[in-house]
């Protein structure tokens, strides 16, 4: 006989899984105008956090990536670290919508605490480079692309709905169903799924380790 999860068991669900479910729900309900508003908000918030510092972050929607009806799948957000003194780009990384939403929640949550405590000046001191710190967070988010089923294996494949899976889980699932196991969207043909792009090469990594922000996420070159 099957058993139902008790309320106590539900409360013991891994925090990581609960956070993932919330992010998936958030991305599902997000409208295009709200998305653009969040991009603008991050530019404003990070500018305030980095006030008085030599570097700042700039968030932009990659041109053309949001032009289709399936913009949530295709859209890419470019995060660039810029030196205010000479305008030089020091690092540039690219995120998908899911990764951007995670970063948005992280930054706005910390900013709310800083601003409400009236310690914005301390938070933007010369001792802590906000731009480099948040570029490091972008690296963490884009490096930890995980399987939506087991939340452990590295994602090898992504579906049109933007949910990603490791090869082991997707092999088990595809033999039983043609729907995404997370959102249940139907996948009608094999060519509707895509193999994840390879991780940065050794040469790429060597170029980025010179600076914390230079190791942030997937390399992006305009």
Curated annotation (Swiss-Prot):
UniProt protein name: RING finger protein 141
Keywords: Metal-binding, Zinc, Zinc-finger
Superkingdom to which the source organism belongs: Eukaryota
GO molecular function: ubiquitin-protein transferase activity; zinc ion binding
InterPro entries recorded: RING-HC_RNF141, RNF141-like, Znf_RING, Znf_RING/FYVE/PHD, Znf_RING_CS
Protein's GO biological process: protein autoubiquitination
Keyword Metal-binding: yes
Organism, scientific name: Danio rerio (Zebrafish)
Zinc finger (RING-type): 147-184
